[in-house]
């Protein structure tokens, strides 16, 4: 079964909380702060694995979460870091943000590693805050929250050569014949229900061929299985457009050719700019000659491309086709390898966050209470516990409480009026 798309909620581990603790030992009368820091939360990584060929291992999971860091302890003990999570995916998997549809990363080679959710840093214990001005700090921090994302995983098979054509064009038979694989074949619609890959060897070189199934008229609009599988064409360097000339398969092979071309145009016309080998198949059929002549006559009116005539089943004339495919591949190999390396390098191992201006919003809730919020305020609300007066004072400094209160006054609020940050009420001074 082909499982090539799924959506998962991913969460990195939260950082552990720092603690407030005091040294109380008979031989150390000075005492002092002794609270340790929290451990770092685990990261979530994506890693390419060429041994996988579908997303079935992820299909039935709703979420994947890394381990939280442990809280700090007394005696300056730092909490244990949370374990990282490594999600293995097949090579060819594209991961997008399911909310924004932004592509996050393309996994293009085995071993490629990408940090998709970063674990939160551990919070500081009170020992961290000791200074010449504050020798007994009653301060601590909670750990940072781990990053989260709802991500869509979509597998687009990576192949050097993709075989296109209507059902019964003989794509699976040709891949079987050239690669000595054993794909299911028969003379009925949609024999192949998922992209099938075969390695074709020729003159000490090898290329991966993919049989792309399900393309019929209106495939680009979702008819048949076409829309699900057209996407696999996008990664192929070359395409073979296979057209059956057997009477049992077609009334007009040129019309069959145009059907596929129109579907490619509607799906993504850029695909037509790639090298496409036009191949008439099943020339071994006794009734094929008239269809061959009909196709060649009509095709010459629109193109001067070379048309190959083969029998995939009997391997007739296939060497000529392979010779030209491998020759063209060698011409472009270095360029494609360079482009692949550049693309992989464009996905840095550690994401670079886009800095955004922090905008503070002031809105009234259903009870006419002012609600103040921003990313910075939410961050420090989560980081600083309100368990000591010093922590509360530090929170107010971090969010610039004086500026918030002045803005509320400018909006008509008065001294003594209440306002809310997250779930905590404050009064304007």
UniProtKB/Swiss-Prot annotation:
Q: Fetch the CDD domains from UniProt.
A: Obg (cd01898)
Q: Note the superkingdom of the native organism.
A: Bacteria
The record's annotation in Gene3D superfamilies points to: GTP-binding protein OBG, C-terminal domain, GTP1/OBG domain, P-loop containing nucleotide triphosphate hydrolases
Q: What is this protein called?
A: GTPase Obg
**Which cofactors is this protein said to need?**
Mg(2+)
Show the HAMAP family listed in the entry.
Answer: GTPase_Obg (MF_01454)
- Residues in domain Obg? 1-158
Disulfide partners: none
This protein's assembly is summarised as: Monomer.
What function is annotated for this protein? Answer: An essential GTPase which binds GTP, GDP and possibly (p)ppGpp with moderate affinity, with high nucleotide exchange rates and a fairly low GTP hydrolysis rate. Plays a role in control of the cell cycle, stress response, ribosome biogenesis and in those bacteria that undergo differentiation, in morphogenesis control.
Q: What class of enzyme is it?
A: hydrolase
> Which molecular-function annotation in GO is an example for this chain?
GTPase activity
Organism this protein belongs to: Malacoplasma penetrans (strain HF-2)
**Annotated binding of Mg(2+), by residue:** 172, 192
A GO cellular component annotation here is: cytoplasm
List the InterPro entries.
G_OBG (IPR031167), GTP-bd (IPR006073), GTP-bd_Obg/CgtA (IPR014100), GTP-bd_prot_GTP1/OBG_C_sf (IPR036346), GTP1_OBG_dom (IPR006169), GTP1_OBG_dom_sf (IPR036726), OBG_GTPase (IPR045086), OCT_dom (IPR015349)
Q: Write down the Pfam families for this protein, in alphabetical order.
A: DUF1967, GTP1_OBG, MMR_HSR1
Gene Ontology terms describing biological process: ribosome biogenesis
Positions of the OBG-type G domain: 159-330
Write out the entry's keywords from A to Z: Cytoplasm, GTP-binding, Hydrolase, Magnesium, Metal-binding, Nucleotide-binding
């Amino acid at each position: 079964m082909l499982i090539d798309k799924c959506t998962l909620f991913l969460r990195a581990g939260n950082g552990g909380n720092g603690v407030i603790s005091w040294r109380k030992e008979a031989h150390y009368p000075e005492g002092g702060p002794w609270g340790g820091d929290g451990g770092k939360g685990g990261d979530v990584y994506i890693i390419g694995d060429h041994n996988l060929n579908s997303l079935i291992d992820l299909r039935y999971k709703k979420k994947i979460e890394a381990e939280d860091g442990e809280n700090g302890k007394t005696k300056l003990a730092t909490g244990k870091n949370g374990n990282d999570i490594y999600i293995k995916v097949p090579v060819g998997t594209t991961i997008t943000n399911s909310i924004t549809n932004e592509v996050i990363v393309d996994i293009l080679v085995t071993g490629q590693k990408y940090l998709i959710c970063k674990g939160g840093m551990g919070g500081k214990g009170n020992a961290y805050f000791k200074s010449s001005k504050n020798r007994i700090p009653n301060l601590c921090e909670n750990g940072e929250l781990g990053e989260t994302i709802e991500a869509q995983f979509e597998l687009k098979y990576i192949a050097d050569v993709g075989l296109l054509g209507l059902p019964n064009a003989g794509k699976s038979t040709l891949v079987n014949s050239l690669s000595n694989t054993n794909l299911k074949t028969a003379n009925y619609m949609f024999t192949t229900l998922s992209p099938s890959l075969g390695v074709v060897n020729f003159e000490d070189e090898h290329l991966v061929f993919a049989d792309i199934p399900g393309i019929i008229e209106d495939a680009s609009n979702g008819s048949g299985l076409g829309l699900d599988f057209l996407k696999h064409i996008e990664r192929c360097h070359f395409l073979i457009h296979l057209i059956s000339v057997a009477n049992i398969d077609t009334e007009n092979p040129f019309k069959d050719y145009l059907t596929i071309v129109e579907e490619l145009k509607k799906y993504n016309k850029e695909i037509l700019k790639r090298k496409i080998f036009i191949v008439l198949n099943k020339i071994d059929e006794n009734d094929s000659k008239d269809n061959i002549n009909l196709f060649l006559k009509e095709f010459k009116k629109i193109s001067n491309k070379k048309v190959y005539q083969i029998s995939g089943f009997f391997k007739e004339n296939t060497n000529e086709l392979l010779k030209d495919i491998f020759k063209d591949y060698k011409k472009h190999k270095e360029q494609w390898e360079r482009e692949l390396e550049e693309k992989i390098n464009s996905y840095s191992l550690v994401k670079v966050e886009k800095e955004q201006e922090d905008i503070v919003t002031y809105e009234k809730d259903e009870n006419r209470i002012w609600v103040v919020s921003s990313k910075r305020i939410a961050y420090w609300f989560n980081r600083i516990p309100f368990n000591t007066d010093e922590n509360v004072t530090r929170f107010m400094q971090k969010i610039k409480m004086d500026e918030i209160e002045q803005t509320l006054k400018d909006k008509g609020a008065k001294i003594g009026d209440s306002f809310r940050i997250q779930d905590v009420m404050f009064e304007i001074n």
